[in-house]
């Protein structure tokens, strides 16, 4: 089915982020065909329906020729509308909103921080507290890697703001249902 039929047209889209609607993060996991244009079609469909993608991670899956996609959208209780529309795309094999179920969720961040010897000692203490790793050291900077729940990464980043954060990159959430 074409994108226009699956997602409608922009001026007919129902906007989920109207001021009268309380938005909640919804974690959606999909198994999609691993071919060019799939990510664009999924993102366009979400946008056409008025859903903002806050986080997105896509990578290889356990099935050859398929990718696993995890994305977080801001939505009210009508996230099922978006999931139903995405199911209509021929590239989407499986999709579900797992927000109401028990799931494991992780994110990775790399943070480049500048600092001399004195700052490094304090930074190493912070790295240890968060079970993070130093993955690169240069004369005036280091790169810290942290993996964990979104809140853990947010907390580490807040603490590092007291230092000279030169660069920050985050992967976005990856998630799996518990015990499935």
List where the protein language model places each region.
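Long, contiguous binding/interaction regions
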Residues: 2-68, 72-180
């Amino acid at each position: 089915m074409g994108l226009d039929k699956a997602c409608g047209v922009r001026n007919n889209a129902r906007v989920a982020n109207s001021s009268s609607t309380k938005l909640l993060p919804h974690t959606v996991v999909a198994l999609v065909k691993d071919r060019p244009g799939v990510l664009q079609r999924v993102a366009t469909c979400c946008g056409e329906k008025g859903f903002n993608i806050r986080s997105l991670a896509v990578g290889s899956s356990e099935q050859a020729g398929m990718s696993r996609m995890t994305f977080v959208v801001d939505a009210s209780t009508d996230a099922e509308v978006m999931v139903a529309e995405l199911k209509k795309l021929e590239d989407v094999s499986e999709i579900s909103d797992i927000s109401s179920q028990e799931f494991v969720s992780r994110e990775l961040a790399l943070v480049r921080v500048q600092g001399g010897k004195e700052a490094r000692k304090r930074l190493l203490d912070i790295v240890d507290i968060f079970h993070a790793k130093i993955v690169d050291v240069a004369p005036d900077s280091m790169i810290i890697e942290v993996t964990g729940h979104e809140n853990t990464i947010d907390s580490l980043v807040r603490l590092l703001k007291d230092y000279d954060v030169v660069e920050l990159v985050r992967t976005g959430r990856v998630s799996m249902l518990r015990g499935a």
